[in-house]
């Protein structure tokens, strides 16, 4: 059995399936992740029926040729209490998607990008919509514009909004991302001082995301992010 403290609050290079197999049941409070959709975006440059910007060098790996095996999803549900999985609509044969509380991310796109994305959640409730501009050069927070290092990178600000709504700051459990990619989940957690673990099997993406995380962790904070989050949630 793996000591979870050995991989906590950092990004680990490796196969997430092998990591999860060494974790006990329900040791993760929330999984917030974005697995490969199996639509071969590295070759086609397309997501759904729309073209994605392909100008940046996002790495040589053909990481999106296949959907992860069902065993990955079985292990994710075994080790975690709750799950938020982007692209859940692509994984209908891999997991139980009987959920009323799906997330819709409206990107406010006007170009050739996919106008929105879906995320499965295991939570009760109604559909939740988040609007966060992510359209080529345009981003919601232009003052803190993110460098895009991954084709399906999720904006940190969006993930922080999702965490504010779904993560129980008073319980203080661990958030995990087993398909870490650009490291956005790890960074969002670090900015909130939420305990996290992240796993990425591509060495290229691992190195780039590690730099992003270290840069974020180097930022000086006046207040504990977790205390701020608790205060906000307790006022609801």
Model-derived features: positions:
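Conserved SAM/SAH-binding loop
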Residues: 14-18, 226-229
